Amino acid sequence: AIFVRCSSSWFFARITPTVFYNVHMNHDEAFLGNNCPVTYFVPNYYYEFFYRPQACGIKVEILQEVILLKTKLKYVSRNSTVRAEIPLMCVFRK
């Protein structure tokens, strides 16, 4: 599961350790955008990312009525060459 929220001053994502095809990943194998690490975690339950929109290579798109923040969630296995990505987006009103 993935939960995403944002505002003009922060981007928040909470993920479960099995978000990538039920492969269990450790907190140090999950990254936001340009390799920003997990900022808080409860082992085996969830991992959180909490960053400013200017960090981690988060892209900001200004649309007519809303602001769109775009980034990605990355899995980089420590024990193999397995890599995976999921795009993340969040919208808020101007």
Task: Tell me what each language-model feature is.
Residues F3, S7-K94:
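Beta-strand-rich globular domains of non-transmembrane regions
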